[in-house]
Design a protein with these regions (language model features):
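Hydrophobic faces of well-ordered beta-strands that scaffold small-molecule active sites
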Residues: 29-33, 60-62, 109-111
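Alpha-amylase-like alpha-glycosidases and glucanotransferases acting on alpha-linked glucans and related
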Residues: 1-27, 34, 88, 105, ...
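Aromatic-lined carbohydrate-binding/catalytic grooves of carbohydrate-active enzymes
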Residues: 40, 51-100, 107, 115-122
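Short hydrophobic/charged patches on amphipathic alpha-helices used for structural packing
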Residues: 46-49
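Glycine- and acidic
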Residues: 29-35, 80-83
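Active-site mouth loops of central-metabolism enzymes
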Residues: 33-44
């Protein structure tokens, strides 16, 4: 939790909070990017920071980079482990090193962490499929199509061509997810 946060980051937090509406100040210019498409790996990112700073970028939003199933990553959004960086991008240590480098240079780092769904290989999904009611409650699951059909009336499909509908039948749970 926050108590375990590094002291220098707590000081930075307090300074920002003391500035009042700092988020309205236009002192931050952000950029979103995929690590692999911009720099290849997290270890390569520090060498790109001067270029970003030349552009006036001091706030970097990295698109999903946590472990997800090969070939089923949904662009990194089907996370199988929120505590592991996908090896294609590097390691958690590489991410921590990048964050430290950025902070030393007065830059901010934000991660795109998708908490509203997981991959079917995530620990929570595995426990839900094994019948653990606590973990089944982490997901919207239904025994029949009645409620999913109601959702489908107003909920736009994300991938209508490749994965039509917003619910999938899970044979292990015998439920719509």
């Amino acid at each position: 939790g926050y108590q375990a946060r590094e002291e220098q980051l707590k000081v930075r937090d307090q300074k920002k909070a003391a500035e009042g509406n700092w988020f309205l100040s236009q002192s931050l210019a952000g950029m979103s990017l995929y690590v692999d498409r911009f720099a290849g790996t997290l270890k390569s990112m520090p060498s790109k920071l001067p270029h970003l700073q030349d552009l006036g970028v001091n706030f970097l939003h990295l698109m999903p980079l946590f472990e997800s199933p090969q070939g089923e990553s949904d662009g990194g959004y089907a996370v199988s482990n929120f505590r592991k960086v996908d090896p294609r991008f590097g390691s958690l240590e590489d991410l921590i090193a990048l964050r430290k480098t950025m902070h030393e240079q007065g830059m901010y780092l934000m991660l795109d962490i998708v908490l509203n769904h997981t991959s079917h290989q995530h620990e929570w999904a595995m426990k839900a499929k094994a019948g653990d009611q606590e973990y089944q409650n982490y997901y919207y699951t239904y025994e029949n199509r009645w409620i999913p059909n109601e959702f489908e009336q107003a909920m736009p499909e994300i991938f209508p061509e490749s994965a039509p509908g917003n619910f999938t039948w899970n044979e292990e749970m015998k439920r719509w997810v």
